[in-house]
A protein has these predicted regions:
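S-adenosyl-L-methionine-dependent methyltransferase catalytic core, i.e., the SAM/SAH-binding region
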Residues: 1-204
Length: 204
């Protein structure tokens, strides 16, 4: 938006952002998004940018991995995050870190233990790594800032978050609230609604 519309001096009365996840990408086993599908452990939306998850895990330190799993994995149990991080770091040290999704999911399942098996044991780990590798929340913030720059006074910004995990609604709500408090033209309070519920359906 800022590279196309802004130089043209175009102002929009409304902008709609679809933050939903691409089902074709998730359904493609070669992209490594689903723990139950076998494929390379990649987890990138744009395979021309950054490094695959298998390479990232070989370089990240334990404390940073614990933070990523805890912050982006929608878990309030720090013990689970530490168990997974320890298992990954040990596998890296012993040169046996899996490079495929199913094998990595098995490693995560073994680390978490049976008491954590209410859902697919690797679901939240895959989600956390995906969010971090793709900088999903940073991209969301950049998109909303760019939209605000091209909107005219009193313009409306709509955001569809059908597939956005629950924790993504927090920064989204803060951005809306910040815009509402800074912009006197906002006559209505911002509303956020996630039709997808609290879980990311693409990782089930």
């Amino acid at each position: 938006m800022d590279t196309v519309l802004k130089p043209l001096g175009v102002k929009c009365s409304g902008v709609f952002l679809d933050l939903g996840i691409s089902s074709p990408q998730f359904d493609d086993g070669s992209r490594g998004f689903r723990p139950e599908q076998d494929g390379p452990l990649d987890l990138r939306f744009d395979i021309t940018q950054g490094v695959p998850a298998s390479d990232f895990l070989k370089k990240v330190n334990r404390d940073e991995l614990v933070r990523i799993l805890h912050e982006y994995g929608e878990t309030t149990d720090p013990v689970a995050a530490r168990r997974i991080a320890d298992a990954v770091c040990l596998a890296v040290a012993e040169d046996r870190l899996p490079s495929t999704t199913k094998a990595f999911a098995s490693l995560v399942a073994s680390a978490k233990g049976k008491e954590y098996q209410a859902m697919h044991p690797a679901k939240l780990t895959f989600q956390a790594l995906r969010i971090h590798l793709n900088q999903e929340f940073d991209e969301m913030r950049r998109g909303m800032r760019a939209a605000a720059e091209v909107m005219m006074d009193g313009g409306r910004l709509g955001v569809l978050t059908v597939s956005l995990c629950f924790l993504g609604l927090r920064p989204l709500s803060r951005i809306f609230q910040s815009r509402a408090s800074d912009d006197t033209s906002c006559r209505e309070p911002p509303h956020t609604h996630n039709r997808g519920g609290n879980n990311d359906p693409h990782n089930t």
